């Protein structure tokens, strides 16, 4: 029978080897050496067959105590080695939080979006309310409520996308004005702008699109005059195109305003002397406007003898083309990164 001293020596040797294991692989080798099928502890168990029945229990208990001590020491050492490995990994992967971060490539505000926001901010500063409406609209609000009955010849001026006989894609944002007036139950004042997409059956080319944006404005109150319209539009022109700009009003025709005017701004490129932008005229057309037709007020429940108003409509697409020298409206809608990247520089410089 193996002596107790020798068994204790085996245990001491195993514990020494475990404590000296430098990594998890070395520890695994120690485990195999002592606890494997051909290991030292397994070799002790083979001696059981040579012992008497009285000796076997005590011997087996002693061997199990050695095995448990070795297993416990291996588990403790493994935990230490795993923590050391983790600490080393963390040390190697330490991030210096004082270093500058990697730059992220940022886009820029779309030139059309920037123009719309600029116009909206301008009118908000003048006390206007922004009102949105339906893009799929009823024929009544798109035409009839705006002094365009079904038999009116001016309907031919706008080729329309009809969904059903009485439902269509709006051809302007004027239906928002009609609905707003109707909701006010004949009580002023009303001071709104209506931005949004509109649709017409145009053939797409450099200056036309079947879908484009429009911003219309409406003011209805007592004693509103043509001079109020002119003063408002002069301010808008100066804010959008420069303080030195002037405007001129030319007689025109719109079914929902009377009188109606086309509004031109003095050319911001040549200062009115004549160039390719203004086609040598010194003036650039920017919007249409006029005094709200009494029929429109009456159909919405307003007393036209008490209330008057003015309305105007502008195309942000055209204004953006003029401001940024864009020659083709289709550039706004094709999402060409080469085109859009140009406006990142404009935004970085803080230009409008």
From Swiss-Prot:
GO terms for molecular function: ATP binding; catalytic activity, acting on a protein; magnesium ion binding; phenylalanine-tRNA ligase activity; transferase activity; tRNA binding. Its EC number is 6.1.1.20. Keywords: Aminoacyl-tRNA synthetase, ATP-binding, Cytoplasm, Ligase, Magnesium, Metal-binding, Nucleotide-binding, Protein biosynthesis. Signal peptide: none annotated. The keyword Lyase does not apply. GO terms for biological process: phenylalanyl-tRNA aminoacylation. It catalyses: tRNA(Phe) + L-phenylalanine + ATP = L-phenylalanyl-tRNA(Phe) + AMP + diphosphate + H(+). One of its GO terms (cellular component) is cytoplasm. Mg(2+) binds at residue 258. PROSITE patterns: AA_TRNA_LIGASE_II. Belongs to the class-II aminoacyl-tRNA synthetase family. Phe-tRNA synthetase alpha subunit type 1 subfamily. Tetramer of two alpha and two beta subunits. This is Phenylalanine--tRNA ligase alpha subunit. The lineage of its organism: Bacteria, Bacillati, Bacillota, Bacilli, Bacillales.
């Amino acid at each position: 029978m193996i002596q107790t001293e020798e068994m204790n020596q085996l245990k001491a040797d195993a514990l020494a080897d475990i404590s000296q294991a430098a990594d998890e692989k070395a520890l695994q080798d120690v485990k195999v050496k002592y606890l494997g099928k051909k290991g030292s502890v397994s070799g002790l168990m083979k001696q059981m067959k040579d012992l008497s029945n009285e000796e076997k229990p005590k011997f087996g208990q002693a061997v199990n105590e050695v095995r448990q001590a070795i297993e416990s020491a291996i588990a403790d050492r493994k935990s230490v080695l795993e923590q050391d490995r983790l600490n080393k990994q963390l040390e190697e992967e330490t991030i210096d939080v004082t270093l500058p971060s990697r730059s992220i490539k940022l886009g820029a505000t779309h030139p059309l979006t920037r123009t719309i926001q600029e116009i909206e901010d301008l009118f908000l500063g003048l006390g206007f309310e922004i009102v949105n409406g339906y893009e799929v609209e009823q024929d009544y609000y798109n035409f009839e409520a705006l002094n365009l009955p079904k038999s009116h010849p001016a309907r031919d001026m706008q080729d329309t996308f009809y969904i059903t006989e009485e439902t269509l894609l709006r051809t302007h944002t004027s239906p928002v004005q009609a609905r707003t007036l109707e909701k006010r139950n004949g009580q002023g004042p009303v001071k709104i702008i209506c931005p949004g997409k509109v649709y017409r059956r145009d053939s797409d080319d450099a200056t036309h699109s079947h879908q484009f944006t429009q911003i219309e404005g409406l003011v209805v109150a007592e004693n509103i005059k043509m001079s109020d319209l002119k003063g408002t539009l002069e301010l808008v022109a100066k804010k959008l195109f420069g303080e030195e700009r002037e405007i001129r009003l030319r007689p025109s025709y719109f079914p929902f305003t009377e009188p109606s005017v086309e509004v031109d701004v003095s050319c911001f490129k040549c200062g009115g002397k004549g160039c390719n932008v203004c086609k040598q005229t010194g003036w650039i057309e920017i919007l249409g406007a006029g005094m709200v037709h009494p029929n429109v007020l009456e159909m919405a429940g307003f007393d036209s003898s008490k209330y008057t108003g003015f309305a105007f409509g502008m195309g942000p697409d055209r204004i953006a083309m003029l401001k940024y020298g864009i020659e083709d409206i289709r550039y706004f809608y094709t999402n060409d990164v080469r085109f859009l990247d140009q406006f990142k520089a404009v935004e970085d410089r803080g230009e409008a």
